[in-house]
Each structure stands twice: as C-alpha cells, then as structure tokens.
C-alpha cells in the first residue's frame, strides 16, 4: 500500500479491524483492488475492498448491510473525502469462479 495517502491507509486499516470484530474468524481475506491497488487513483476514486468469508449466501445477505454501515461511518468520519466500496463474497465461490469471471480475475490480479 505504498504511495497511498495516510488518511486512506488509516481508513482501510480501521475498516479491516471493524470487519474482523464483526465477522471474526469467518473473514478469510480482505483485498484492496481497483485504482488504489494499481496506484492510478485520483480524487474521485472510491476505495474498492473485497471481503472473502466462509459465510453462506444467506449469512452474507445478513451482514452486507452491517458492512455497508461500517463503511458509511468511516466515510462520514472523513467528511466523505474518501468512499469505501466493500464487496463481500464467499471464498469457495470466489475460487470456483476465479478463472471464469473477469471481475474476479481482476481482483486477483490487482489485489493487495
């Protein structure tokens, strides 16, 4: 995460900690992808984060709103100068579809 502004790094770290508190060991991996991972971000870029878990689909649906609320709280703390854009997926399905879905391939390729 070099060359990323300090406030963005701190927000990503805070978000990751809050996700760990919420989901515990169910979190298998947190991936930063997109423009911040590639280093070609600008002032309008959002912060793309994928959360891979071992949760079932119905559990993911339950937690999706809570995760969005966590992201919103951090965005609010930063006066919306940054925008976290979290996505939560089941790790087994991610790995299964990794070589078939371009979105997953990009996350894997760019992700840090």
Regions found by a protein language model. Name each.
Residues 48-52:
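Short beta-strand->loop micro-motif that forms the acidic, two-metal-ion catalytic signature
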Residues 1-29, 38-43, 54-112:
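Catalytic core of pol beta-like nucleotidyltransferases
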């Amino acid at each position: 995460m070099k060359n990323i502004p300090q406030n963005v790094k701190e927000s990503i770290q805070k978000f990751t900690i809050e996700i760990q508190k919420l989901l515990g060991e169910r979190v298998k991996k947190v991936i930063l992808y997109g423009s911040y991972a590639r280093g070609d971000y600008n002032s309008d870029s959002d912060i793309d984060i994928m959360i891979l878990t071992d949760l079932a689909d119905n559990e993911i649906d339950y937690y999706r709103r809570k995760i969005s609320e966590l992201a919103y709280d951090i965005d609010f703390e930063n006066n919306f100068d940054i925008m976290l854009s979290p996505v939560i997926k089941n790790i087994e399905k991610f790995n299964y579809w990794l070589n078939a879905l371009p979105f997953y391939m990009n996350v894997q390729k760019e992700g840090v």
